[in-house]
């Protein structure tokens, strides 16, 4: 499963309402960390967001090291990902999201994201590309 950058932000001590990694470690979601994959562009996006928020560079570097060790990180510059991301860019304004979604499409893996535009287009994406789009709440185990 490809995870969006949002879920990596807590590793750089950036608070989010949807801490997928913590929930996974605690067994509260239906996906294990070992099943999660990250686009390399998410590392850059995390770094940029952390810089904007004034997070110390040492914390960011540590987060990037953890991501590289804990996850399968997929390059964003493969021919297929570039082609699909350019195609998606015609209807999606955020190129980071295009690349992350393109990574899921090219690998044939499901995507978990909180992005409202992707969720608005979820039915079309799922039908056209035969992947599933989830958000954090949909991965929570039923109690």
Locate the predicted segments by residue.
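Alpha-helix capping/helix-boundary segments
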Residues: 7-8, 42, 80-81, 99-100, ...
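Acidic, PIN/NYN-like endoribonuclease modules and their adjacent C-terminal/linker elements
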Residues: 70, 74, 105-106, 110-143
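Short, well-structured N-terminal submotif of metal-dependent ribonuclease cores
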Residues: 1-38, 50-62, 140-142
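Short, conserved catalytic or adaptor-binding loops enriched in Gly and charged residues
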Residues: 26-31, 64-68, 124-127
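Acidic, metal-associated active-site segment
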Residues: 94-110
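Acidic catalytic patch
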Residues: 68-90
